[in-house]
């Protein structure tokens, strides 16, 4: 086991090496966004009007991610070495290669809108703590139905993005639903190390919600006396409407695998056994902390030596809040490489309206939604779950895995894959 003191010593040495190499390093960062590249500012950042999110009014959405390494904190205080993605959409191109140890877990959430053109640039900034590695990286848009094979990311049939390089992926967002994304190069290793993120596409039907917006089908905009915030699918009748939405990515890590990786030792693929279960990259009680978690000391040491600020590696929380009468959407995904997980919500009514980014409907259009007390997801699976709070008592409920051995942070009980649902 690598002690905390030794780990911080390794970080300090890596920081000194990075400073020594900074003057001679050379890389080309090339960002693409829209026809004629009109979404890219002069400094290489993406213009605000083209960035992803609900405020984007145009036909094009763009994002710029980096792939590299970093450190993350477990709920029991342990620090793990990780790989991951970071969002540099607003950064100047010349600053992107300086984004050392910026990997996030979970990766930055990607929120998109049906019908738009999506340009996603990936820049490989290399591994600050493992300069011996020359790993390429990719972004695999998991579940995207019209993905060309060359964008799949598997090394056998498509390309990878090499160190110091940038590649832009293009997608026409024809189908709404809950997806996910991950690196597909050396997938078992890179996914175990943390290259996983939430991704969802909101339906065109959401366009009817603004005041005075055309609504030719007279689709209801309100439920339980409250205006809806959106729909999961183009349902035509508001059956998938919701007031609040939360992405919840299930995952876990094997701390031995991560420590051996940092120690440049052979990796135990055959013996991989995850012992840190998480939701959105955190174990309970960190899941309900509404703030970004502080950066681990190892990351702070490295970036302080370069006179750069250390941002959080785990900004996404999993606290679910609602006002009584609201319908809550849970966009649940599992990108784990070792386990299936079953999730329950302590007796709250759960209705599954979609699986695998597809609305549950029969060939004649009959809705096949179903009520359940739990949802089981294997690696690469997603589900859209609605919880109607209109008949629920005000209070705090727990959403957790029924795999009770995963309600722990390694040897610390009452943690792991659990969060809270607070109904006011």
What are these regions, as identified by a protein language model?
Residues 22-24:
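N-terminal signal peptide c-region/cleavage motif recognized by signal peptidases
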Residues 11-19:
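Hydrophobic helical h-region of N-terminal Sec-dependent signal peptides
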Residues 2-11:
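Bacterial N-terminal signal peptides that target proteins for export
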Residues 2, 15, 26-424:
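Copper-binding active sites and cupredoxin-like electron-transfer domains
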């Amino acid at each position: 086991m690598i002690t905390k003191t030794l780990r911080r010593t390794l970080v300090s040495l890596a920081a000194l090496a990075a400073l020594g190499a900074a003057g001679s390093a050379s890389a080309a960062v090339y960002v693409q966004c829209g026809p004629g590249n009109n979404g890219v500012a002069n400094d290489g950042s993406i213009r605000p009007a083209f960035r992803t999110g609900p405020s984007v009014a145009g036909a094009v959405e763009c994002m710029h991610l980096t792939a590299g390494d970093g450190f993350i904190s477990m709920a029991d205080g342990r620090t793990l070495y990780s790989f991951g993605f970071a969002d540099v959409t607003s950064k100047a191109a010349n600053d992107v290669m300086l984004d050392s140890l910026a990997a996030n877990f979970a990766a930055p959430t990607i929120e998109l809108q049906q019908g738009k053109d999506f340009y996603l640039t990936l820049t490989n900034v290399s591994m600050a703590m493992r300069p011996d590695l020359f790993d390429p990286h990719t972004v695999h848009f998991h579940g995207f139905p019209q993905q060309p094979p060359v964008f799949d990311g598997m090394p056998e049939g498509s390309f990878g993005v090499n160190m110091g390089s940038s590649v832009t992926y293009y997608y026409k967002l024809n189908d709404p639903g809950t997806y996910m994304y991950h690196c597909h190069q050396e997938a078992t290793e890179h996914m175990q190390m943390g290259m996983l993120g939430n991704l969802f596409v909101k339906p065109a039907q959401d366009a009817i919600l603004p005041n005075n917006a055309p609504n030719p089908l007279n689709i209801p905009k309100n439920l339980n006396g409250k205006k809806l915030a959106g729909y999961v699918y183009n349902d035509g009748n508001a059956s998938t409407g919701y007031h609040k939405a939360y992405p919840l990515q299930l995952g876990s890590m094997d701390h031995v695998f991560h420590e051996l990786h940092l120690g440049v030792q052979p990796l135990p693929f055959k013996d991989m056994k995850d012992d840190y279960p998480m939701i959105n990259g955190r174990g309970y009680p960190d899941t309900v902390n509404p703030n970004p978690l502080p950066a681990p000391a190892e990351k702070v040491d490295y970036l302080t030596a370069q006179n750069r600020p250390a941002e959080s590696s785990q900004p996404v929380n999993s606290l679910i809040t609602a006002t009584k009468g609201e319908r809550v959407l849970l966009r649940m995904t599992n990108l784990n490489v070792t386990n299936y997980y079953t999730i329950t919500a302590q007796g709250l009514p759960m209705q599954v309206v979609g699986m695998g980014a597809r609305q549950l409907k029969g060939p004649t259009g009959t809705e096949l939604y179903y009520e359940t007390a739990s949802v089981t997801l294997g690696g690469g699976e997603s589900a859209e779950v609605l919880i109607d709070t209109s008949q629920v008592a005000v209070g705090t409920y727990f959403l957790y895995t029924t795999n009770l051995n995963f309600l722990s942070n390694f040897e610390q009980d009452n943690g792991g894959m659990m969060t809270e649902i607070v109904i006011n």
